[in-house]
Amino acid sequence: MALLSLITPDFGLFFWQTVIFLVTLYLLSKFAWGPIMSAMKEREDSITDALSAADKARADIEKLQATNEALLAEARIERDKILADAHKAATTMMEDAKVKASTEGNRLMEAARVSIQTEKNAALHEVKNYAATLAVEIAEKILRKELNNAEEQKKLVSEYIKEVNLN
């Protein structure tokens, strides 16, 4: 029983502990409970605000990422267009240069043909004039010399031909 008296509280002890507890509870609720609850409310509000700000920041970041992706896609399209235009311009320039070179080559070839034809005609004209002059000279020499027989004529013509070949 001695042990049981140590564990079982007495009525007076129980009464005073209850009174002290209630007074402490009243004092805490009157003076400490309000500031503690307001501090807890402020902390809860600040945490809620921080979470809202984080959600808003996340949404803003997602929006910026979407905008960034759209801008990158637009830049890629623009780059591809510029490259295609540059390739097209280069191809056009090369084709124009080929056409111009071909035209210029044809013009030079035609000018060379005309020049060659002119030179050929001039040379033929000169040869004809020379042949005519030679024929006239030969005829003149033949007519000056009276030829009596065919043998002398052949000999004279052979000499004149050799003379013409040497000149």
Curated annotation (Swiss-Prot):
<dbReference type="GO" id="GO:0045259">
    <property type="term" value="C:proton-transporting ATP synthase complex"/>
</dbReference>
<dbReference type="InterPro" id="IPR005864">
    <property type="entry name" value="ATP_synth_F0_bsu_bac"/>
</dbReference>
<dbReference type="GO" id="GO:0046961">
    <property type="term" value="F:proton-transporting ATPase activity, rotational mechanism"/>
</dbReference>
<dbReference type="GO" id="GO:0046933">
    <property type="term" value="F:proton-transporting ATP synthase activity, rotational mechanism"/>
</dbReference>
<dbReference type="InterPro" id="IPR028987">
    <property type="entry name" value="ATP_synth_B-like_membr_sf"/>
</dbReference>
<comment type="similarity">
    <text>Belongs to the ATPase B chain family.</text>
</comment>
<protein>
    <recommendedName>
        <fullName>ATP synthase subunit b</fullName>
    </recommendedName>
</protein>
<keyword id="KW-0138">CF(0)</keyword>
<keyword id="KW-0997">Cell inner membrane</keyword>
<keyword id="KW-0066">ATP synthesis</keyword>
<keyword id="KW-0472">Membrane</keyword>
<keyword id="KW-0375">Hydrogen ion transport</keyword>
<keyword id="KW-0812">Transmembrane</keyword>
<feature type="transmembrane region" description="Helical">
    <location>
        <begin position="15"/>
        <end position="37"/>
    </location>
</feature>
<dbReference type="GO" id="GO:0005886">
    <property type="term" value="C:plasma membrane"/>
</dbReference>
<dbReference type="InterPro" id="IPR050059">
    <property type="entry name" value="ATP_synthase_B_chain"/>
</dbReference>
<dbReference type="Pfam" id="PF00430">
    <property type="entry name" value="ATP-synt_B"/>
</dbReference>
<comment type="function">
    <text>Component of the F(0) channel, it forms part of the peripheral stalk, linking F(1) to F(0).</text>
</comment>
<keyword id="KW-0813">Transport</keyword>
<dbReference type="InterPro" id="IPR002146">
    <property type="entry name" value="ATP_synth_b/b'su_bac/chlpt"/>
</dbReference>
<comment type="function">
    <text>F(1)F(0) ATP synthase produces ATP from ADP in the presence of a proton or sodium gradient. F-type ATPases consist of two structural domains, F(1) containing the extramembraneous catalytic core and F(0) containing the membrane proton channel, linked together by a central stalk and a peripheral stalk. During catalysis, ATP synthesis in the catalytic domain of F(1) is coupled via a rotary mechanism of the central stalk subunits to proton translocation.</text>
</comment>
<keyword id="KW-0406">Ion transport</keyword>
<keyword id="KW-1133">Transmembrane helix</keyword>
<comment type="subunit">
    <text>F-type ATPases have 2 components, F(1) - the catalytic core - and F(0) - the membrane proton channel. F(1) has five subunits: alpha(3), beta(3), gamma(1), delta(1), epsilon(1). F(0) has three main subunits: a(1), b(2) and c(10-14). The alpha and beta chains form an alternating ring which encloses part of the gamma chain. F(1) is attached to F(0) by a central stalk formed by the gamma and epsilon chains, while a peripheral stalk is formed by the delta and b chains.</text>
</comment>
<keyword id="KW-1003">Cell membrane</keyword>
